[in-house]
Design a protein with these regions (language model features):
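Extracellular/periplasm-exposed beta-strand and loop segments of Gram-negative cell-envelope proteins
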Residues: 42-80, 107-147, 173-211, 242-310
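Outer-membrane beta-barrel "beta-signal"
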Residues: 31, 307-323
């Protein structure tokens, strides 16, 4: 009897020890992460046409008939450089495998997309006795985007508090815009005398077509406590978008709203304020380049769609809480 009780006691102790060991070795199921990232662009491409202006950095010199292009360089880059903040929910199926879903907000650095210095704006009417207007402008773009990023995570094992992991996933944009802000300076001369100066400002908002991107990351977490860890990730993402529509939401001259007003420098029409991006222009398109009837100012302008890149390599630092 005593022998049976002793065996029973040993069995209970063994089962308790095994249960405690399994509990200790069992990975957390749900976890959450808060992180902040900084990305650098990994590839540069030529920027799209901005308001009819080629993606060049042009410099003109001379006056009237002697106003000539003396320097031109292509403006290249991408919107892959910038800051991102995000929150992530994850679930571990096993010691090695898990899934995550991240919600991220990204703001790129501003990038110069087109620039011109001292170009004669009215070459057909300017003369030594009639007004000659010269324009200088800079157009800068910035992307702001909210996306969801589901991913599969492979944990590589824990040692000395560190647990490295890798993950791959997709990037699904939920909302985002490319904001293009252009500052123009129009300087008007009659002969050698300056008779007028107009500072014009416009803001164009480009909305993209639906698309999808891809990401891969290598990271590690480090335990700070029972449920709290710090983590760091090196992430690469490959992502391009192309425009669907563009709207001029602001246009001022010397600080006065002229969005829907005809001026010496711009027609305040639907065609000026709205653009529909297409893959092909033909004689039926609302574009003066291909339509023999010119532009219908009461309808949105048709322009060729082009791509901009948001690919980048970034470092994310943050805190992880495990349930």
């Amino acid at each position: 009897m005593k022998k049976n009780l002793l065996l029973l006691g040993l069995l209970v102790c063994s089962m308790t020890t095994m249960a405690q060991t399994e509990k200790a070795e069992k990975p957390e199921s749900w976890y959450f992460k808060l992180g902040a990232s900084y990305f650098n662009q990994t590839a540069s491409t030529e920027f799209p046409v901005v308001g009819g202006q080629l993606p060049n950095r042009d410099v003109y010199e001379g006056t009237l008939a002697n106003n000539r292009l003396v320097s031109r360089e292509s403006v290249t880059g991408s919107f892959g450089q910038g800051f991102r903040s995000g929150i992530t929910g994850g679930y571990r199926f096993s010691t090695r495998l898990g899934v995550e879903l991240s919600a991220n907000y990204y703001v790129s650095n501003e990038k110069t997309m087109s620039q011109t210095t001292n170009r004669l704006a009215n070459p057909t009417t300017a003369s030594a006795t009639t007004p000659a207007t010269y324009v200088s402008f800079t157009a800068e773009g910035q992307i702001k985007a909210f996306d969801l990023a589901p991913a599969i995570v492979m944990f590589l094992g824990e040692a000395h508090g560190f647990e490295p992991y890798t993950k791959v996933g997709v990037i699904v944009p939920v909302h985002g815009t490319l904001d293009i802000k252009t500052n123009r300076e129009y300087t008007t001369f009659v002969g050698a005398n300056q008779v007028a100066k107009t500072d014009a400002y416009s803001k164009d908002v480009v909305k993209p077509n639906a698309t999808i991107g891809f990401m891969a990351a290598l990271g590690t977490s480090y335990k700070l406590g029972k449920n709290l860890s710090a983590f760091a990730e090196l992430e690469y993402r490959n992502f391009t978008v192309h425009g669907k529509t563009k709207e001029t939401t602001e246009y001022t001259e010397n600080g006065v709203d002229k969005l829907n007003t005809n001026t010496n420098f711009r027609v305040g029409s639907t065609a000026s304020n709205h653009t529909h991006y297409v893959d092909r222009l033909d004689t039926n398109s609302n574009n003066a380049l291909t339509n023999p009837n010119g532009v219908d100012q009461s309808k949105p302008m048709d322009e060729l769609s082009s791509y901009v890149g948001i690919s980048g390599l970034g470092l994310t630092l943050g805190i992880k809480y495990s349930l």
